[in-house]
Structures are given as structure tokens and as C-alpha cells.
A protein has these predicted regions:
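N-terminal membrane-targeting/pre-transmembrane regions
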Residues: 1-33
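Single-pass alpha-helical transmembrane signal-anchor segments
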Residues: 20-27, 40-55
Length: 148
């Protein structure tokens, strides 16, 4: 029996703190040249924009079910799933580096150091495999099955 896997690739806490810091710094810069009130408005606006960017970047979902794999907006039907390889940090670095292929579909996040490589078994698709960031590569592989 295959389990299902669903995760949101949320940005880590330091990214959120940097977004807030961006707002504070922007407010200070504006305050130096104008008034406190205008600086405060600039700080709130800049922080809101930076936080929205971090939230949007981390809103991408990875879902693996017996029916297939969804990575962001992309979908790979189970009928086209080949070999599924969970990758630890070292394997992930190799897959994104010297073992990479420019034709591969990638959904990666720099703050997630593990992922899965899923071979694409569709003769009409030029994509050889998908590389998808996930904090739980074994869970994604388990949800998809063994690929045979």
C-alpha cells in the first residue's frame, strides 16, 4: 500500500528575518532623508513586500501519490514514472552538479539539501528525469512506489 506525501517547501526562519530586516533598513534610510512617519510607512511597505516575496517563494508544494508526482504546477503521471532515487545531501549536490542534465525538469530550493530524482518513462517527453527538492526523499519515493 502506497502512502501519500505532501509538503510545502517553506523558506527557513533566517529568510523571514532578513525580510523584516529589509523593511527596517529601508525605513531607516527613508527616515534619514524625510520624517519619522514617512520612514515608518516605508518600513512597513518594504517589509510587507519582502515578506510576500519570501512567502510566495516558499509556497511551492510537492505532492506524491499513487497517481503521480506534482512539483509546483508540474505533473508527472504515475504511468510515466521510472526509477525513483531518494538523494541525500551528497547525492543531491552531485545530481545538481556533475551528474546533471540541462534537459531535466528541476524544482529546487537552495535551503533544502535533499531531494529525489525521478526518471521519466515517456518516449514523447524529452525530459530524462525530474529533480525535486524535498525534506523527505524517502517518503516521496515510498508514495510513488518502486517505479517498475
Amino acid at each position: 500500500m502506497n502512502a501519500e506525501h505532501s509538503e510545502r517547501l517553506t523558506a527557513p526562519l533566517p529568510w523571514w528575518l532578513i525580510a523584516v530586516g529589509t523593511g527596517a533598513f529601508t525605513g531607516w534610510l527613508v527616515r534619514v532623508a524625510t520624517t519619522f512617519e514617512i520612514g515608518l510607512v516605508a518600513a512597513v511597505a518594504a517589509a510587507a513586500i519582502a515578506l510576500a516575496v519570501v512567502a510566495a517563494y516558499g509556497a511551492v508544494r510537492v505532492q506524491a501519490t499513487p497517481e503521480g508526482l506534482r512539483a509546483g504546477r508540474a505533473w508527472l503521471d504515475r504511468a510515466h514514472v521510472g526509477t525513483i532515487e531518494p538523494l541525500d545531501a551528497e547525492g543531491w549536490a552531485r545530481a545538481l552538479g556533475r551528474e546533471g542534465d540541462v534537459r531535466a525538469f528541476t524544482l529546487t530550493r537552495p535551503y533544502i539539501r535533499t531531494g529525489v530524482r525521478v526518471a521519466v518513462e515517456d518516449p514523447a517527453d524529452p525530459t530524462p528525469f525530474w529533480l525535486v527538492s524535498t525534506r523527505f526523499p524517502a517518503s516521496v519515493a515510498r508514495a510513488l512506489g518502486d517505479g517498475s
